[in-house]
Amino acid sequence: MRQEHKKLLRLVITALLVALVFCGSKIEVVLPLSVGGYSRFHLGNIMCALSGILLGPWWGGLAAGLGSALYDCTNVLYITEAPITFVTKGLYGVIAGAVFVAVFRRKATYPAMAVSTVCAAVSYIIIYLAKTFFYNSMLLEGMSASAAWVATVLKVPSSLFNGGVAIVLAPLLAFAVLRALRMARLDDALNPSEK
């Protein structure tokens, strides 16, 4: 495959993953909370990890961040957080991709992809809960530290669920997609150096 075709295919796959992250974030169940507003279960984190595994840290992070930020821009509950979401969800893809590329050398096995997703999910949960405590609860809503702590703790179950689902499903999807791309001889576009 010529270099121009590889670049174009990588761009197309990146755009497709932006759309999948967006759609995965739309598939949600919003839960009202007694303190701190709301929480939600969604499938966006699966696609963020998938983006990092398939595209590597930089392109995968871009797809994860952009798809998630676009979702935030379409929802009045989250529109003000779109720039923060771009960074935090982008980091989800960057971490999944960095672990998969640097540690596992893109070895397409379920354990390698699962460990990459675990690292990304745990990192994201910590970042998300810290953002919830400091930014959402204390800064925006003016809560005391104890009320902010309660609001943050109420978001732990949905965060763990979203992370757990991503840990199970993202590697399975990545394995299937990589296999299909390999059979179609299109996997070359995913493996060039991160330029």
Put a short name on every predicted segment.
Residues M1-K195:
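Loop-helix junctions at membrane interfaces
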